[in-house]
């Protein structure tokens, strides 16, 4: 009966005297008989399996007996409540005066539902071999495996598949760094595998536009110093202080490469950090030196400073690109990152080390170019004209060369 019961009636009783369990059961049968009619007679309900056995627990102390009654019911709510109220009509148990009061009527199904929920929580926390994987996680895992499979070597050193064909190269410390950059779509990275720079990579840095992307620690400083001596660096990007390139998120990688500095202006991170270290062995930092006045730039940097102070305007870029069948990738300051044939602009945007802020192209802006630009985070696309777009992302602004030149 307990397996099919819908409700459990719980009642408490107090008896002015010492009674046994059988006295309580007999009182429940005898004093409710005929009270509710034949349809709710306890013996008949038990015979038809609509009511379970009457379970009684009883204790005696100080000349009084007290305990509780539990009855399982598969009747409906109204009939169960009526039967429970009938139990309170019991006034005597055995030869003694008694008081019976229904404490509660428990919905067994609700209790089972609570058990199911609690068990489901437990299983969710402990029974699965792996955490829940959503669709984005699955796609990222597949992309990562494909990109890791794409890892090649350059003269025996780990490299992305585009190192030979690209006109720019990103030099990193180890294989794990190459894998991380591949995962984020950067396919022209090559690893030096230590602080001793291989001759092949030193030569590569002289042949291509070279960016060193190094860890934010003393090891990165050592590699940077040696690259500056045996190779030819154009730019330097660093992981945040104390962090490794292989552990960086996509956002941090993009930010570091976008904010790369000219190699001539790059300062070692460890040196910068140690400037505030104590000079006497104490824990108190040494005073920060006053910055040198910048009223007298060195003669060697005059040309660079002038160029940096006055980059071409967007209109000038648009006029320069018009009728040339070329494309320019520009950063936030409208400085040129790269110039490629217009036919290669989609691949150039997709594979750019540093995500361009603006792309100016002497060609029609197609849906494919717009999709790739929006995916990479390009803010503005400027072209000779535009296709009819099926969808146009709000984050990427589309204009024509004529608009930009005015």
Curated annotation (Swiss-Prot):
GO terms for biological process: DNA replication, synthesis of primer. GO terms for molecular function: DNA-directed RNA polymerase activity; metal ion binding; poly(A) binding. Residues 261-272 have a biased composition (Low complexity). SUPFAM superfamilies: DNA primase core. Residues 259-309 are annotated as: Disordered. Binds two Mg(2+) per subunit. This is DNA primase DnaG.
């Amino acid at each position: 009966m307990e397996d099919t019961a819908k409700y459990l009636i719980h009642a408490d009783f107090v008896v002015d005297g010492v009674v046994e369990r059988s006295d309580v059961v007999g009182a429940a049968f005898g004093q409710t008989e005929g009270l509710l009619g034949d349809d709710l007679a306890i013996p008949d309900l038990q015979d038809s399996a609509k009511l379970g056995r009457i379970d009684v627990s009883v204790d005696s102390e100080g000349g009084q007996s007290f305990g509780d009654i539990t009855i399982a019911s598969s009747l409906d709510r109204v009939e169960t409540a009526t039967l429970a109220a009938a139990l309170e009509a019991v006034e005597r148990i055995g030869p003694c005066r008694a008081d019976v009061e229904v404490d509660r009527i428990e919905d067994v199904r609700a209790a089972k539902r609570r058990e199911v929920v609690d068990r489901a929580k437990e299983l969710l926390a402990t029974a699965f071999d792996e955490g829940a994987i959503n669709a984005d996680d699955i796609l990222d895992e597949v992309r990562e495996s494909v990109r890791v499979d794409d890892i090649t070597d350059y003269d025996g050193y780990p490299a992305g598949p585009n190192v030979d064909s690209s006109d720019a190269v990103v030099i990193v410390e180890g294989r794990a760094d190459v894998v991380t950059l591949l995962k984020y779509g950067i396919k022209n990275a090559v690893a030096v595998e230590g602080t001793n720079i291989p001759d092949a990579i030193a030569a590569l840095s002289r042949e291509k536009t070279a960016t060193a992307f190094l860890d934010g620690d003393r090891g990165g400083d050592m590699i940077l110093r040696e690259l500056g001596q045996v190779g030819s660096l154009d730019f330097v990007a660093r992981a945040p202080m104390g962090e490794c390139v292989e552990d960086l998120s996509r956002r941090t990688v993009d930010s570091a490469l976008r904010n790369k500095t000219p190699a001539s202006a790059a300062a070692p991170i460890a040196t910068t950090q140690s400037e505030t270290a104590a000079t006497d062995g104490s824990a108190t930092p040494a005073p920060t030196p006053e910055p040198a006045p910048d009223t007298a730039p060195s003669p060697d940097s005059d040309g660079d400073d002038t160029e940096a102070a006055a980059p071409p305007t967007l209109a000038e870029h648009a006029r320069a690109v018009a009728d040339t069948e070329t494309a320019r990738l520009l950063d936030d300051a409208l400085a040129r990152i790269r110039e490629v044939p217009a036919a290669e602009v989609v691949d150039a945007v997709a594979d750019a080390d540093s995500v361009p802020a603006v792309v100016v192209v002497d060609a029609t802006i197609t849906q494919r170019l717009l999709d790739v630009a929006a995916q990479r985070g390009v803010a503005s696309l400027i072209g000779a004209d535009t296709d009819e777009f099926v969808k146009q992302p709000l984050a990427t602004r589309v204009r024509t060369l004529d608009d930009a030149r005015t």
